[in-house]
């Protein structure tokens, strides 16, 4: 029995806890695997389901989110599901308009330009209560998973969310967001604090609704050097973990493993390993053996095959997976890609990746 905002939930018993055991640092019989963006446009059934409505309407439909989350599990023997949603539901909940422009990505018609624009943002407590549709999607999906594998909830980290809110969309340089850090450090901290104040109840709410693990995406870590990262990203990454854990305990909810994925944040690996997360996700630019040396045995590592490796032949994918697993070692490890799946990828190659992880990790343990 688990509590959530809708009363006590009776969820089906979990049959495959390999992913959770690896996340907690316990021994596993094989290496668990899932893929970032496993519910994505590379699947024809995903494109068919999504064609019916615009992107954020889909995000607000618990039924559609549940269906999209389950689709990859019908095809592949994945060891975890991740709820279909988007990190930008948080700026929306704060009252900002966000649209998804086909072929271009997210767009904010009125980005934050001045410090006074922060006054437009909704109160963080009110913003968190706007996200009930995500909680409903999680509860529905957890029921329909029928205990097959654990369900991961997620959110974007404060700095990454700030970049979209200030830039007004994607950017190759993040120059406007970084200008804020240099010219308006206090306003930047204020905004990052507001985002943290929304993320904490949002992530706790996801667990209350049925999420069994949480991943925080710091997708734009690589745009910050060591100094800016330690000033404007890391303190909030730490704060989210600390406050979510305390909040779960206060609400009488069981702890869940938390994953931090800071893309291109290899310069802060040691700090991330000590930021209060059980798992550190790696992108493909990090050598597994070196990462293991740098973080020690205190955390589980997740990653980190180059997604583009899935354009290779199945034989080559098998070889690359074998190398990756040999380098990471059998325990305290969750296999994944170093970034999300791309829309033009062949589902059969994704299947080959998943199968190769299971096959080789079992052989690795026998030897």
Swiss-Prot record:
Pathway: Porphyrin-containing compound metabolism; protoporphyrin-IX biosynthesis; coproporphyrinogen-III from 5-aminolevulinate: step 4/4
Location(s), subcellular: Cytoplasm, Cytosol
Enzyme class of the recorded protein, top EC level: lyase
Keyword Acetylation set for record: yes
One Pfam family this sequence matches: URO-D
Gene3D superfamilies the record matches: 3.20.20.210
Modified residues (N-acetylmethionine): 1
EC number assigned by the record: 4.1.1.37
Annotated coproporphyrinogen III binding sites: 37, 39, 41, 86, 164, 219, 339
GO-annotated biological processes: cell population proliferation; heme A biosynthetic process; heme B biosynthetic process; heme biosynthetic process; heme metabolic process; heme O biosynthetic process; porphyrin-containing compound catabolic process; protoporphyrinogen IX biosynthetic process
Binding site for coproporphyrinogen I: 37, 39, 41, 50, 86, 164, 219, 339
UniProt site (Transition state stabilizer): 86
Listed GO CC annotations: cytosol; nucleoplasm
Subunit text: Homodimer.
Protein function: Catalyzes the sequential decarboxylation of the four acetate side chains of uroporphyrinogen to form coproporphyrinogen and participates in the fifth step in the heme biosynthetic pathway. Isomer I or isomer III of uroporphyrinogen may serve as substrate, but only coproporphyrinogen III can ultimately be converted to heme. In vitro also decarboxylates pentacarboxylate porphyrinogen I.
Family per record: Belongs to the uroporphyrinogen decarboxylase family.
Name of protein: Uroporphyrinogen decarboxylase
Protein's organism: Mus musculus
Name of the gene encoding the protein in the UniProt record: Urod
């Amino acid at each position: 029995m688990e509590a959530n905002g809708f009363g006590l939930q009776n969820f089906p018993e979990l049959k495959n806890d390999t992913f959770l055991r690896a996340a907690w640092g316990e021994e596993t019989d094989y290496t668990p695997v899932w893929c970032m963006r496993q519910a994505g446009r590379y699947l024809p059934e995903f494109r068919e389901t999504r064609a019916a409505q615009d992107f954020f309407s889909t995000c607000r439909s618990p039924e559609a989110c549940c269906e999209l989350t389950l689709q990859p599990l019908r095809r592949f023997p994945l060891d975890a599901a991740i709820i279909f949603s988007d990190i930008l539901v948080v700026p929306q909940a704060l009252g900002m308009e966000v649209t998804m422009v086909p072929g271009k990505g997210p767009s904010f018609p009125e980005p934050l330009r001045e410090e006074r624009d922060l006054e437009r943002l909704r109160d963080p407590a009110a913003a968190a209560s706007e996200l009930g549709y995500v909680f409903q999607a999680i509860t529905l999906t957890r029921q329909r998973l029928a205990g097959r594998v654990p369900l991961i909830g997620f959110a974007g980290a404060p700095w990454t969310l700030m970049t979209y809110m200030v830039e007004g969309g994607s950017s190759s340089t993040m120059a406007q967001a970084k200008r804020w850090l240099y010219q308006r450090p206090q306003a930047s901290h204020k905004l990052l604090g507001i985002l943290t104040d929304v993320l904490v109840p949002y992530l706790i709410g996801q667990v209350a609704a049925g999420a069994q693990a949480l991943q925080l995406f710091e997708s734009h870590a690589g745009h910050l050097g060591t100094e800016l990262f330690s000033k404007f990203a890391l303190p909030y990454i730490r704060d989210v973990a600390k406050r979510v854990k305390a909040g779960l305990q206060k609400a009488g909810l069981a702890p869940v493993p938390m994953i931090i994925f800071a893309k291109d944040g290899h310069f802060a690996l040691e700090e991330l390993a000590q930021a209060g997360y059980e798992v550190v996700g790696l992108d493909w630019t990090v050598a597994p053996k070196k990462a293991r040396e740098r973080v020690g045995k205190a955390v589980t590592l997740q990653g980190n095959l180059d997604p583009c490796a899935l354009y290779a032949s199945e034989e080559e994918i098998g070889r690359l997976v074998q190398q990756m697993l040999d380098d990471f070692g059998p325990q305290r490890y969750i296999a994944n890609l170093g970034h999300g799946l791309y829309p033009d990828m062949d589902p059969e190659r994704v299947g080959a990746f998943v199968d190769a992880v299971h096959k080789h990790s079992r052989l690795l343990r026998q030897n």
